[in-house]
Amino acid sequence: MTGKKRSASSSRWLHEHFSDKYVQQAQKKGLRSRAWFKLDEIQQSDKLFKPGMTVVDLGAAPGGWSQYVVTQIGGKGRIIACDLLPMDPIVGVDFLQGDFRDELVMKALLERVGDSKVQVVMSDMAPNMSGTPAVDIPRAMYLVELALEMCRDVLAPGGSFVVKVFQGEGFDEYLREIRSLFTKVKVRKPDSSRARSREVYIVATGRK
């Protein structure tokens, strides 16, 4: 911390983080992040992943979701993952490092998907948070709109979409947009999601 004292809020966050039971379980199990548990809860209720599927993972680093999905889709399945940050390799995951908002990165990602029939698009993307909702929510909504655009481009009929969304301005409109594209849409707040967080997960199945 370059010799400076931590702020009260950052110290509180660190204490909360390391005393979090899901963080502790992730460390014990050798998991990459507590996000593994969120996706496990969603899978238990919605049964999105099956052996042999092709899955796109947006905002993948450090790899918690990809690490989980590999256990569900098996050796014949395939994950195409993307993140601005680096990610250590995972067997069965084709990782592209780059900014998903960049047109060239989007093009490279689509090339990796190729002619594959994608059964699930999942997005855990989030912007760097400033703590100011008027700034953070529009940035977050832009990312989830891009994720939905990816669904339009690559998701097979009958496919599924799971996306982290921060509740706030634009949320209801985005939910309506998803409902127009999928036959069944649920809003989930996993137990492993921190209670005070604005995040929820939209789980949409049955791409029209």
Swiss-Prot record:
GO terms for molecular function: rRNA (uridine-2'-O-)-methyltransferase activity. The keyword Cytoplasm applies. Pfam families: FtsJ. Specifically methylates the uridine in position 2552 of 23S rRNA at the 2'-O position of the ribose in the fully assembled 50S ribosomal subunit. InterPro entries: RNA_methyltr_RlmE, RNA_MeTrfase_FtsJ_dom, rRNA-MeTfrase_E, rRNA_MeTrfase_gammaproteobac, SAM-dependent_MTases_sf. GO terms for cellular component: cytoplasm. The gene is rlmE. This is Ribosomal RNA large subunit methyltransferase E.
